[in-house]
């Protein structure tokens, strides 16, 4: 699968273009996270000047219906009044102390009350820190070196987890990016997702050396791919049988697909619960906040209570915890129902428009998260299937939507996110844009 070559979008964004040029002189690639650069779709990334509710406004003054929601955190919509008030009040008391605060206790209590397997919680500042710390803790707790992950699952830019599959089943991984050494990735094994046989084989070969299996609760970075029925339970059974920990990465799904994240949405109960979970995105309300937590006996191995070191100057930052606490408290059952209603309306309209235009596609869901695969396959359940997309069709679809004032994720391999603020007017604008975008996708099919 080759990367598409950049091509200009049909609409004009001169201020964004000028900012992108300036940014490229002082920021590698002109962005602070690669997907923002539009390399997968071509054209000029839109520089956002402001956001409110379901809308983004770019530096050229153009408004877009936002289907990124900051890649997931903005479940209430942008600049929600409750969150804005909480952040404003917290800022009046100072920005950072380097000491414990009541708010971090309140936020930890809120999460522990929501997610039954989480008995204790440690806060950090990013999802990458959360997964990095969780696998360190798993190794420290078990005394074992090997981590098992799934192909296509993304857990942040952790050296040990930036690894691709080897040439055969359950082979030790090679690093997937320059700068990650074979030593860093050498104790990581990558196996196919939703494959119980591969899981059994890797434990047959290496079971006494495996510290943990880490999995996205529902994959969202190869497009949305949920675990197949029975797979989560099998993960729990096999890891428990071999004395390995099960780590569920809920950075994306946590507090978005339900009040208790994927754990609550899937509803398998404590019998099949993971030992450790990681959180981010929604729990920070748009601010840098994340966490990892789980069984008290495992968490007790963290410093200062135990020997596994982990620390952070801004962990539990008072403004970030204020935003997170206000966000979670505002996430009522009515909010989750509104998000689900909005997501259902958009995904059904997208599928109908693509079908009418004769574009082969498949819509995968995980709660209110979803993605559209531009594929003729009947199902997408793993990374190899997810990669079989018509990227030319997606690229044309993306730019048509953008030109009509709807900002999708600029990659065919990302989830679409909606918020409780996506009202009938916002959804109507999306629905109105879809037929032309679907026709553009049909014309762009196979162009890459």
UniProtKB/Swiss-Prot annotation:
Pfam families: Aminotran_3 (PF00202)
Residues modified as N6-(pyridoxal phosphate)lysine: 281
The EC number(s) this enzyme carries: 5.4.3.8
Catalysed transformations (reactions): (S)-4-amino-5-oxopentanoate = 5-aminolevulinate
InterPro entries: 4pyrrol_synth_GluAld_NH2Trfase, Aminotrans_3, Aminotrans_3_PPA_site, PyrdxlP-dep_Trfase, PyrdxlP-dep_Trfase_major, PyrdxlP-dep_Trfase_small
SUPFAM superfamilies according to UniProt: PLP-dependent transferases
Keywords: Cytoplasm, Isomerase, Porphyrin biosynthesis, Pyridoxal phosphate
Subunit details: Homodimer.
Similarity field: Belongs to the class-III pyridoxal-phosphate-dependent aminotransferase family. HemL subfamily.
Protein name, UniProt field: Glutamate-1-semialdehyde 2,1-aminomutase
Species classification: Bacteria, Bacillati, Actinomycetota, Actinomycetes, Kineosporiales
């Amino acid at each position: 699968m080759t990367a598409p070559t950049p091509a200009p979008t049909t609409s004009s964004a001169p201020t964004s273009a000028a900012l992108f040029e300036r940014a490229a002189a002082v920021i590698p690639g002109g962005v602070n996270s690669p997907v923002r650069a539009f390399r997968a779709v071509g054209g000029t990334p839109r520089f956002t000047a402001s956001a409110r509710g379901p809308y983004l406004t770019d530096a050229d003054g153009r408004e877009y219906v936002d289907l990124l929601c900051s890649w997931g955190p903005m479940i209430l919509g942008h600049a929600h009044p409750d969150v804005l008030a909480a952040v404003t009040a917290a800022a009046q008391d100072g920005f950072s102390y380097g000491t414990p605060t009541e708010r971090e206790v309140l936020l930890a209590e809120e999460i522990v009350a929501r997610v039954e397997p989480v008995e204790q919680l440690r806060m950090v500042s990013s999802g990458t820190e959360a997964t990095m710390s969780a696998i360190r803790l798993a190794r420290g707790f078990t005394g074992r070196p090997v981590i098992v992950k799934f192909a296509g699952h993304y857990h942040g830019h952790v050296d040990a987890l930036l690894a691709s599959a080897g040439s055969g089943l359950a082979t030790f991984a090679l690093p997937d990016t320059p700068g990650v050494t074979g030593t860093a990735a050498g104790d990581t094994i990558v196996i196919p997702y939703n494959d119980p046989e591969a899981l059994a084989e890797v434990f047959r070969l290496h079971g006494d050396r495996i510290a943990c299996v880490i999995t996205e609760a529902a994959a969202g970075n190869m497009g949305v791919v949920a675990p197949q029925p029975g797979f989560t339970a099998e993960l729990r059974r096999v890891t428990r049988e071999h004395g390995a920990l099960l780590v569920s990465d809920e950075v994306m799904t946590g507090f978005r697909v339900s009040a208790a994240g994927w754990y609550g949405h899937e509803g398998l109960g404590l019998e099949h619960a993971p030992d450790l979970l990681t959180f981010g995105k929604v729990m920070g309300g748009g601010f840098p906040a994340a966490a990892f937590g789980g069984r008290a006996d495992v968490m007790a191995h963290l410093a200062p209570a135990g020997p596994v070191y982990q620390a952070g100057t801004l962990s539990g930052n008072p403004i970030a915890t204020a935003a997170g606490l206000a966000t979670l408290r505002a996430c009522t059952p009515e909010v989750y129902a509104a998000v689900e209603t909005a997501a259902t309306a958009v995904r059904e309209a997208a599928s109908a428009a693509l079908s009418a235009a004769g574009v082969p596609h498949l819509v995968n869901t995980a709660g209110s998260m979803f993605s559209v695969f531009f594929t003729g396959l009947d199902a997408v359940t793993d990374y190899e299937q997810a990669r079989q997309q018509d990227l030319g069709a997606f690229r044309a679809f993306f730019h048509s939507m953008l030109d009509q004032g709807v900002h999708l994720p600029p990659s065919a391999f990302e989830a679409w996110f909606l918020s409780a603020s996506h009202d009938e007017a916002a959804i109507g604008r999306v629905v109105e844009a879809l037929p032309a975008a679907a026709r553009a996708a049909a014309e762009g099919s196979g162009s890459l």
